[in-house]
Amino acid sequence: MSSGGLLLLLGLLTLWEVLTPVSSKDRPELCELPPDTGPCRVRFPSFYYNPDEQKCLEFIYGGCEGNANNFITKEECESTCAA
């Protein structure tokens, strides 16, 4: 195979990697946790990643404890789990 062919193949493989959606294997484990409001009673609008729907959804966080699948913004949730 010529060097031009190798460069083309390398370019196509790179493009395929960039355009391929993230699989559940690539997501941090925290993205698989269920939403957890925690025991406190403050009501903070927050976001969690729902692996079944493959998107970030809003939930109410109580303000303490809970788990790591808890994001202040939808954008933060998406960049961590749905990228």
UniProtKB/Swiss-Prot annotation:
Belongs to the venom Kunitz-type family. Disulfide bonds join C31-C81, C40-C64, C56-C77. It holds the Pfam family Kunitz_BPTI. The keyword Lyase does not apply. Keywords: Disulfide bond, Protease inhibitor, Secreted, Serine protease inhibitor, Signal. Expressed by the venom gland. This is Kunitz-type serine protease inhibitor textilinin-2. Residues 1-24 form the signal peptide. The record marks R41, V42 as: Reactive bond for trypsin. One of its GO terms (cellular component) is extracellular space. GO terms for molecular function: serine-type endopeptidase inhibitor activity. Serine protease inhibitor that inhibits plasmin (Ki=2.2 nM). In vivo, reduces blood loss in a mouse tail vein bleeding model. Residues 31-81 form the BPTI/Kunitz inhibitor domain. PROSITE patterns: BPTI_KUNITZ_1, BPTI_KUNITZ_2. Its main location: secreted. It is found in: Secreted.
